[in-house]
Amino acid sequence: MYRKIRPALIFHYFIKPNIYGSIAASVLKIPSIAVVAGLGYSFSKNNWLQYCVLKLYRLSLRSNYKVWFQNSEDAEYFLREKIVSKEQLTIIPGDGICTNTFKPVYNKMTVAKPFTFIMAVRLLKSKGINYYVKAAKMLQEKGYEVECQLIGPFDINHPDSISMNQLQEWQNNDPIHYCGFTENIKAYLASCDCLVLPTYYPEGTPRSLMEACSMGLPVIATDIKGCRDIIQDGFNGYLCTPKDGLELFHKMEKMLLLQPSERMAMGTNGRNKMIEEYDIKKLLIIYQSAIDSFINESQVEKIQTA
């Protein structure tokens, strides 16, 4: 396809296109930009798969025009492993968020029963769903009137997917309400009090965090790369240790015991952060700037070789 179309510049996204697409573009001498949106499941364990992917990244990205990263820690890792150079590297604000679309619904920030937590993820074990379930059960056992919603699609072909039987067991025995998959996450965010993301998956910039913050919701997330770029502990939410259901319970308890005005202040801080740092308009400027720079460099190169 690349040979037939001969594009002037190619953007690649996700692991396979970043690797195979970059190699194909390099063979055809077509400049390309790889967008690394997190390291993904292959980097969740230090094993042969991670080793192979590292080798492929090192082979494929070395000739890229630019390599973009959604968080600073992934960028530092690729630099340390000598996969990319400083000249190639750019850090972008995730996928960007349309803050005009994801807007707060302030009238629901009154004291409401039950207090509603929401977790919106692909149903993978490494997203920390079982720790969310444990924390929800502890809240229930302590007598809190809460609703803990879970939203997201099954990925049955993924090696890390939870089973339908496991989900059914959680719903039968624990205070988890599975809402299925929705195209309209805004409606759920508008009716809840706090978003929870206890992930230990190698994230880029979790979109669910950006959506929740943009809508003025406080957030509880794990203290891992990607999440801590968005959430500042005590400022727009709380951070907790990965794979620690007890600490997650304490942070969820702390959140629901806050005054509504305190949660609203956290939500306002999060929305301001989205507007200032992650708005989609800022990402589009980065794209336009990269294209303009490429065009200018190409024109200079043509003049020099003429």
What are these regions (language model features)?
Residues 58-104:
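Donor nucleotide-sugar binding/catalytic pocket of nucleotide-sugar-dependent glycosyltransferases
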Residues 232-234, 238-245, 254-260:
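Conserved acidic donor-binding segment of nucleotide-sugar-dependent glycosyltransferases
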